[in-house]
């Protein structure tokens, strides 16, 4: 394990902050070379230039945005499984090492990732609605899952940074929040009622923000004059596994990983190395 990775891991104070507030913003972790490669990977993915297709994925089922959708908020799931430059970013051991420290986990595996592109412009429908990641992961046994949000460039207020409701992971926030909801006013009231702070994650290039799966988060419009470009890397502790669950409306809960990781008998294997590779500890 490289000394650089060890020295970059969160301190005890950082871990305590994360567990109290539900998020943590790292010092610079990633090199320009890795982020420049990720930018190339994003352009390739958006152009349909991929290194491989995902096994057991019905064509187009999980890919998300395509050029036919126009210049809107773009979200593409599983991008690192298709494009090598994005896999390089996801497999940076310092990301999973930080996640392991924050979650108190001996092992970290990829859950899935999302390539995110938010166009600039005040009239665009490009808010990311207030939501918790846990809302979409009801079939996961672990409550310690977390996300590393990796921007490819400096993020200032005008870019529409990720915003966290600090401490919301410790409360019952409900399950009716939605990623694509353009109304961000409801959580202002929620935060005021529970005496919680809303924090914006402004970062310099190379920094990463981490948040707990139950932390309420979202982002506002991008007014920077350039698209906001990033990768959300969703991570699971090694002991996470599939559980039967239902949505609030009573329907059976599921996740696209259920199909991608299905065993011969149909049950999902969230440790399938082809879809959910181990990222920490790093390979010898």
Predicted features and spans:
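Short edge-strand/loop segments of extracellular domains
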Residues: 118-120, 165-172, 228, 234-240
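A short beta-loop-beta micro-motif enriched in histidine and acidic residues
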Residues: 103, 133-145, 196-197, 203, ...
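Double-stranded beta-helix
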Residues: 16, 155-216
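Short, structured patches in soluble enzyme cores that scaffold and shape functional sites
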Residues: 114, 132-134, 150-154, 166
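Non-heme Fe(II)/2-oxoglutarate
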Residues: 3, 40, 48, 59-60, ...
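A short secondary-structure junction signal
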Residues: 122, 126-130, 140-141, 158-164, ...
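Short, conserved beta-strand element in jelly-roll/cupin
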Residues: 138-157, 202-203, 210, 234-237
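Non-heme Fe(II)-dependent double-stranded beta-helix
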Residues: 2-20, 27-130, 136-139, 177, ...
